[in-house]
């Protein structure tokens, strides 16, 4: 998908402040507005696509995040490639893994690539943990190759209760190790207790966020993206 070209418009407004009577000299304060578009790619699963439980269209965490950032003066040109049931090593509804989605979404001028997920990698062979590590490494390598100057933000999958199954912890640990090896910023929602004791944020299926859950995700993720783009 093509995205609008990045451009910068520097606009300086001179604001006159009158001191005393009209005959007095005026002082001026320059105001600079920065209209850069920050190109960002997002790779994810059904937590990003949204589901019947919530988060479809403008109610997705991505759409909410772009709105929140725009309100803070950070404008985003995004390519979002997400697929239900997909992971780094497990194909999704249309047969794609995260590496395929990376090839589709990441562009040479990207400033940031965000990876979110995936709990779907529980479906990989637990007897061969190196297979997942290899899939993750290949995905990050592809992102680096396609967007050499981009920062990578890797967000491991959350779990909605404090009782986290072993396979999820292994996925988290693999992602953390590979993110550090790739020089990426790693975020651990399990350690940070995202969604824990917040059942009102999860849909009736007990798995996917509802609309309020997507708003919660945007509140968590928008500052992370802002930090990578503007510090």
Swiss-Prot record:
InterPro entries: GDSL_Rv0518, GDSL_Rv0518-like, SGNH_hydro, SGNH_hydro_sf. GO terms for cellular component: extracellular region. Residues 1-20 form the signal peptide. Changing residue 120 to A: Retains 50-55% of activity. Changing residue 208 to A: Retains 15-20% of activity. It comes from Mycobacterium tuberculosis (strain ATCC 25618 / H37Rv). Its EC number is 3.1.1.-. It catalyses: a fatty acid ester + H2O = an aliphatic alcohol + a fatty acid + H(+); decanoate ester + H2O = decanoate + an aliphatic alcohol + H(+); an octanoate ester + H2O = an aliphatic alcohol + octanoate + H(+); a dodecanoate ester + H2O = an aliphatic alcohol + dodecanoate + H(+). Optimum pH is 9.0 (with pNP-decanoate as substrate). GO terms for molecular function: carboxylic ester hydrolase activity. The keyword Cytoplasm does not apply. Induction: Expression is up-regulated under nutrient starvation (in strain H37Ra). The record marks 87, 120 as: Transition state stabilizer. This is GDSL lipase Rv0518. GO terms for biological process: lipid catabolic process. Expression in M.smegmatis alters colony morphology and growth kinetics, provides resistance to SDS, lysozyme and anti-TB drugs, increases the total lipid content and trehalose dimycolates, and enhances infection ability and intracellular survival capability of M.smegmatis.
């Amino acid at each position: 998908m093509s995205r609008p070209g990045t451009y910068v418009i520097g606009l300086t407004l001179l604001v006159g402040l009158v001191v005393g009577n009209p005959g007095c000299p005026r002082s001026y304060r320059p105001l600079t507005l920065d209209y850069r578009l920050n190109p960002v790619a997002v790779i994810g699963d059904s937590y990003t696509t949204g589901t019947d439980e919530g988060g479809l269209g403008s109610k997705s965490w991505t759409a909410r995040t772009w709105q929140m950032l725009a309100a803070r003066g950070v404008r985003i040109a995004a390519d979002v490639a997400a697929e239900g049931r997909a992971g780094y090593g497990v194909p999704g509804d249309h047969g794609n893994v995260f590496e395929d989605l990376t090839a589709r979404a990441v562009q040479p001028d990207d400033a940031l690539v965000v990876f979110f997920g995936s709990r779907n990698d529980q479906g990989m062979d637990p007897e061969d943990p190196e297979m997942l590590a290899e899939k993750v490494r290949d995905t990050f390598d592809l992102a680096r190759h396609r967007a050499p100057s981009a920062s990578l933000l890797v967000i491991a999958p959350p779990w909605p209760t404090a009782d986290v199954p072993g396979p999820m912890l292994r996925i988290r640990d693999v992602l953390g190790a590979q993110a550090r090896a790739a020089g990426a910023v790693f975020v651990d929602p399990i350690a940070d207790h995202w969604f824990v004791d917040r059942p009102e944020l999860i849909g009736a299926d007990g798995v996917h966020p509802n609309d309020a859950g997507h708003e919660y995700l945007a509140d968590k993720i928008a500052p992370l993206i802002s930090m990578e783009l503007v510090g």
